[in-house]
Amino acid sequence: MKKPAHNLLTAFLLLWLTGLTTACGGDDYYYPDILQDYLTAHSGADGRLQTILTDDGTLYDVLNAVIAPDETSDTTLRIVANYACEEDGVGGQGVRLYAAQTTVSPLPLPADRFEDGIKTDPASVLSIWMGLDYLNIVLEVKAGGGDHTFHFVEDEVRWDETAARREVCLSLYHDAGDDPQYYTRRAYLSIPLAQYATDDAASLSVRFSLLNYEGEEESYVFEYIEP
């Protein structure tokens, strides 16, 4: 394959927003309880996001108009978003998105699928945790305004027949090109894992590795959480 195009500047979704504050007469204002999370969103036929699924398994309708990148219809997107839960007007509860962007979430590929080889430029893990069908990662990378390309390398998949256990070893593909290290930026990644949790696996562990700025390999191991 050609060099994967999952850049540091991931797509920002178009939002038509109401104000964050609502006047309740005089000087009284209501400030909604804003949450920030990784979410799985689905767009409808018109390219607008219809629903979001939280990592605790709760499905909500999206109450405001949010357009998927390129107005892509009938697709599933992994996003990181600021949102608030609100009554939907018919006795239920939905969410209003105040800011959202897609995450870097390609399916991991074996090393031989990268025609130009594996790029292992360093990055720092700010946070990493297991979500619903995804491993969520917030990276800090040193940048100077140029493009950084990310992907995930499937290094090894081991199967224990006796225990019906699958162990998956993944690593970060990071190509910083010639970008100078002037300042630090964040990158939001979320590795899809459902393809490894097939019916024959009673359990699944995921090992994720990357090179840090000290030139050392860091590894993190998680147990997959069944939906």
List the predicted regions and their residue ranges:
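First exposed extracellular module after export/assembly in secreted or surface-exposed proteins
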Residues: 2, 33-227
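Bacterial N-terminal signal peptides that target proteins for export
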Residues: 2-11
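C-terminal motif of bacterial Sec signal peptides marking the signal peptidase cleavage site
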Residues: 18-23
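Bacterial signal peptide processing site
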Residues: 25-28
